[in-house]
Amino acid sequence: MGELLKRADAYTLSRTRKLPDELFTFMAENGFFGMQIAKEYGGNPMSTQAKSCIMAKVSSHSGLLSAMVVIPNSLGAAELLGHYGTDEQKQYYLPKLASGEFIPGFGLTEPTAGSDAASIKAEGEVFKDSDGEIKFKLNFRKRYITLAPVSNLISLAVRLHDPENLLGKGEDAGITEVLLEKGLDGLHIGDHHQPIGEHFPNGPIVGRDVIVPASNVLGGEEYTGMGWKMLMEALAGGRMVSLPATGICGIRHGAMIAGAYSMVRQQFGIPVGRMEGVEHKIGKAAGMTYAFDAARVFGCSAVDKGIQPPVTSAIMKAYSTEMGRDT
């Protein structure tokens, strides 16, 4: 970790909005993309607690660097494949995700859906081609997809319609996770956006009549319509790991800088940090840092024990990021 931060110049990353090739290679060779991938697939598996600590440390250095560590190791293809992927999918995708050959994007958020995942409007129509193979025709507009501009593997949440009941699950097959590789006809990955003024890769993904075989369903055809379950389980854990880590990092960083400056800045011959009004504010910030970090440890420990705490995760996501912003 220390060597990574030494090599990563935060100013250069912010100015160029690009991760240098040599830094990307260093991260791949040292397991930064495989923290939730099993060793048998070339990963570097860690506990939820350990991942959270690493994400917090990286987030204190650079938004771009944070996104490159957080997304591959929280929400996205690696976690879902590890839980639900077929043996063939695991053998094909996971080693390439661990090595950085595949950079994942999590295709959930839309203009009218995000945390409200059930409201997605992305559609897929099930049909048989001239050879009798079952395929999907996908149309969708996704936005605010972190890493999208540099991604080459998208795990896409889409609502499937099966008018001929080819999959045997009724006309409305339900929300399904489909794997898309960059380069498919009709798939357009948009330019770099800055929705909150930060410099990490973020942008839209649009699909117009994108054709993929049914085998691209994450988990295989049997998991058609199981996307809602996958998303809720992934979000429950992911919300506890990544966003609280980055939010609490902001709280801690703000408290540290304010506390240090209050002891350097002097008025009336003493540091302003010795004045009661300033002391109160610095003390409150330090107390909030301690409380939020304790909640993070509690939540991550629960996930490590196999508990998926959706309510706790949602609370942590909301309040830690708000406090990090305000600090």
Residue positions per predicted region:
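Flexible, small-/acidic-enriched active-site or ligand-binding loops
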Residues: 185-211
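FAD-binding core of FAD-dependent oxidoreductases
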Residues: 62-79, 98-113, 141-154, 203
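A glycine-rich, basic-preceded beta-loop-alpha segment at the flavin cofactor/substrate interface
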Residues: 206-239, 256-273, 297
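Beta-sandwich/jelly-roll carbohydrate-recognition scaffolds of carbohydrate-active enzymes
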Residues: 92-96, 108-127, 143-144, 165
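Charged, glycine-rich active-site and insertion segments that engage polyanionic ligands
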Residues: 307-327
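Amphipathic, small/basic residue-rich leader segments at the start of a protein or domain
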Residues: 1-72, 85-103, 115, 130-136, ...
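Extended amphipathic alpha-helical segments enriched in small hydrophobics
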Residues: 239-306
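A short core secondary-structure module
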Residues: 133-187
